[in-house]
């Protein structure tokens, strides 16, 4: 799983190069030598806020942009961690959690992993498993991300969304040294209109199904003792 998650973030590399090119173009000297009037600072700030709001709305409405955005943010977290304090795992995991929280529906994923056991679990057990599941996945994710080596990732398909569509698979290809690995994010649209990641499949391995089977096996092995299954989940399942 670590190998799978470490490759997810590298899609940001190509985007970073494009951003650098755009920055270089923006820095070219203007031929207009006439002094320009200074803009009102409040208007500049207002304009920036409006632009940021529009970009945020676009990302929420477009699942493809959402996947790219979370990847770019993770790349920045990795760079910052490596350059400032590479031994502080607690701070790194906290930064990863901050990035993933708006994009990944951990509650939905935990619900699917528990399967039918969610119906017999108490509210406290469901809440505790969601927390344990999220924290364990983030730590595994974070350690995997630190091993990425700039593998090339391309968007394999970006078909137009149909009206009313609330589920889509964002497909990518991870180009390694000698092999191409297919990657697919399952994205679901919430009632708020926001697209969230609810599952990942890499090279034919469905993360959600794999973890659900592990939860089922652990519950059956331990006489359906959900408290034990939940408390030991981080060490056994991820």
Positions of PLM-derived features:
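Early exported N-terminus immediately downstream of N-terminal targeting peptides
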Residues: 28, 36, 46-141
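Surface-exposed, charged secondary-structure patches
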Residues: 139-181, 232, 236-238
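Solvent-exposed loop/turn segments at secondary-structure junctions
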Residues: 118, 135-136, 175-176, 203-207
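Extended hydrophobic
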Residues: 175-204
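N-terminal propeptides/low-complexity segments immediately following signal peptides
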Residues: 13-46
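Sec-dependent N-terminal signal peptides
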Residues: 1-16
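Short, hydrophobic secondary-structure boundary micro-motifs
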Residues: 86-87, 154, 228-229
């Amino acid at each position: 799983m670590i190998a799978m998650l470490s490759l997810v973030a590298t899609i940001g590399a190509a985007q970073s190069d494009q951003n650098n090119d755009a920055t270089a173009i923006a820095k070219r000297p203007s031929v207009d030598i006439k002094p320009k009037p200074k803009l009102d600072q409040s208007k500049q700030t207002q304009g920036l806020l409006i632009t940021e709001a529009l970009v945020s709305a676009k990302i929420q409405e477009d699942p493809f942009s959402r996947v790219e955005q979370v990847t770019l943010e993770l790349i920045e977290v990795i760079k910052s961690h490596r350059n400032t304090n590479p031994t502080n795992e607690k701070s790194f995991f906290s930064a990863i959690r901050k990035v993933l929280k708006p994009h990944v529906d951990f509650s939905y994923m935990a619900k699917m992993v528990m399967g039918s056991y969610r119906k017999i679990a108490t509210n406290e057990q469901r809440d505790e498993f969601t927390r344990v599941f999220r924290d364990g996945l983030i730590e595994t994710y974070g350690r995997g991300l630190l091993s990425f080596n700039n593998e090339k990732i391309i968007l394999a398909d970006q078909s137009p969304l149909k009206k009313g569509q609330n589920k889509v698979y964002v497909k990518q290809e991870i180009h390694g040294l000698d092999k191409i690995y297919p990657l697919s994010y399952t994205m679901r649209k919430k009632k708020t209109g926001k697209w969230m990641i609810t599952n990942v499949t890499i090279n034919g391995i469905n993360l959600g199904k794999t973890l659900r089977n592990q939860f089922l096996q652990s519950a059956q092995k331990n006489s359906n003792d959900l408290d034990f299954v939940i408390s030991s989940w981080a060490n056994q399942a991820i």
